[in-house]
Each structure stands twice: as structure tokens, then as C-alpha cells.
Amino acid sequence: MSRHQSYPLFNLEQAGVPDDLCPVATVVSPMLPGDWRSMRPVVDRDKCVKCAVCWLYCPVQCVEEHAAWFDFNLKTCKGCGICANECPQRRSR
């Protein structure tokens, strides 16, 4: 017996779908949060104390650790501003 249960294909005629209704295939391009970002985070690298609060609170985990500061991956950052609001030094904006 197979571990996976197979399901019958959906039958349009049995479901009563009109013949003139044509299903259309849609191509969806992958869209990252950074593609629709409204704000861009900026870090004052001289004043960053590397507390990692921005890294901890980022909902999309776009904060990247470097030797002396944290930076943001702008491809995944959605511009929500949580990092700036949570930063105790207010070094990201």
C-alpha cells in the first residue's frame, strides 16, 4: 500500500463549470519584500554598539552581522521601521 494517498483530478464537467470558462495559467514572478519597501534602513556605523536588538526584532531577518556593526539586506528588508524603533541608541533609522 502506498504511503501517499492520491486524489482524483478535479473534473470540470462534473462540477458544472461552463464550457466557455477558460482556465488561465498565470506566471507569477517571485517578489521579495525589498521590492515594495517604503523606507530604507540606515546604520550609523560609528555609533552602533552592536547590541543586536535590531537583529532580534527584525520580522524578516534581514539584519546581517559584520565585524563592528550590523547591516541590512535590502533585498529582504520590508521597510517596517521596527529596527529603528527598538534600537536603544537610535542608530538605525
Swiss-Prot record:
Reactions performed catalytically: phenylglyoxylate + NAD(+) + CoA = benzoyl-CoA + CO2 + NADH
Tell me the keywords, alphabetical order.
Answer: 4Fe-4S, Iron, Iron-sulfur, Metal-binding, NAD, Oxidoreductase, Repeat
Q: Which Gene3D superfamilies match?
A: 3.30.70.20
Q: What Enzyme Commission number(s) apply to this enzyme? A: 1.2.1.58
Q: How is the cofactor bound?
A: Binds 3 [4Fe-4S] clusters per heteropentamers.
Q: Which InterPro entries match?
A: 4Fe4S_Fe-S-bd, 4Fe4S_Fe_S_CS, PadF, PorD_KorD
| EC class (word) | oxidoreductase
Which ranges carry the 4Fe-4S ferredoxin-type domain?
39-68, 66-93
Q: Required cofactors, per record?
A: [4Fe-4S] cluster
Q: How does activity depend on pH?
A: Optimum pH is 8 when measured with benzyl viologen. Half-maximal activities are obtained at pH 9 and pH 6.8.
Q: Choose any GO biological process term that the UniProt entry carries and state it.
A: L-phenylalanine metabolic process
Annotated control of activity = Activated by magnesium ions and thiamine diphosphate.
What's the superkingdom here? Bacteria
GO MF annotations for this entry? Answer: 4 iron, 4 sulfur cluster binding; metal ion binding; NAD binding; oxidoreductase activity, acting on the aldehyde or oxo group of donors, iron-sulfur protein as acceptor; phenylglyoxylate dehydrogenase (acylating) activity
User: Subunit structure, briefly?
Assistant: Dimer of heteropentamers composed of an alpha (PadG), a beta (PadI), a gamma (PadE), a delta (PadF) and an epsilon (PadH) subunit.
Per the entry, what this protein does is: Involved in the anaerobic metabolism of phenylalanine and phenylacetate. Catalyzes the oxidative decarboxylation of phenylglyoxylate to benzoyl-CoA and CO(2). It can also react slowly with 2-oxo-3-methylbutanoate and use different electron acceptors such as benzyl viologen, methyl viologen, FAD or FMN, but NAD seems to be the physiological electron acceptor. Also catalyzes an isotope exchange between CO(2) and the carboxyl group which proves partial or complete reversibility of the oxidative decarboxylation reaction.
Q: What is this protein called?
A: NADH-dependent phenylglyoxylate dehydrogenase subunit delta
Which organism is this entry from?
Aromatoleum evansii
Encoded by which gene? padF
